[in-house]
Amino acid sequence: MKTLLLTLVVVTIVCLDLGNSFSCYKTPYVKSEPCAPGENLCYTKSWCDRFCSIRGKVIELGCAATCPPAEPKKDITCCSTDNCNTHP
């Protein structure tokens, strides 16, 4: 009986997702961090500000439940695998 109970506990732990394991790179530190539950997309936004000619485009990386909406003069890409939004 104890063996059956232990087996059921192990199977339950294996089958349940006890934590969100999906991760994306996030700014400002450009390091991989876990996403919140329900956020299963990684995104990269890039755009030019007034310093673009000196230091290049501004980059924003993060997690999202849906791909962020298009914005004028901003490039937005989304992907759905762990850490797929590497810094361009």
UniProtKB/Swiss-Prot annotation:
Q: Which InterPro entries match?
A: Snake_3FTx, Snake_toxin-like_sf, Snake_toxin_con_site, Toxin_cobra-type
Q: Which GO terms describe its molecular function?
A: acetylcholine receptor inhibitor activity; ion channel regulator activity; toxin activity
Q: Which Gene3D superfamilies match?
A: CD59
Kindly state the tissue distribution recorded for this protein: Expressed by the venom gland.
What PROSITE patterns does the database record attribute to this sequence?
SNAKE_TOXIN
Classify the source by domain of life: Eukaryota
Q: Where in the cell is it found?
A: Secreted
Any idea which UniProt keywords this protein has? Acetylcholine receptor inhibiting toxin, Disulfide bond, Ion channel impairing toxin, Neurotoxin, Postsynaptic neurotoxin, Secreted, Signal, Toxin
GO CC, sorted alphabetically, is: extracellular region
> Does the record's keyword annotation contain Disulfide bond?
yes
Q: Name one Pfam family in it.
A: Toxin_cobra-type
Q: Which residues form the signal peptide?
A: 1-21
Q: List the disulfide bonds.
A: 24-42, 35-63, 48-52, 67-78, 79-84
Task: Describe the task this protein carries out.
Answer: Binds with high affinity to muscular (alpha-1/CHRNA1) and neuronal (alpha-7/CHRNA7) nicotinic acetylcholine receptor (nAChR) and inhibits acetylcholine from binding to the receptor, thereby impairing neuromuscular and neuronal transmission.
Q: Belongs to which family?
A: Belongs to the three-finger toxin family. Long-chain subfamily. Type II alpha-neurotoxin sub-subfamily.
| Official protein name in the record | Long neurotoxin 20
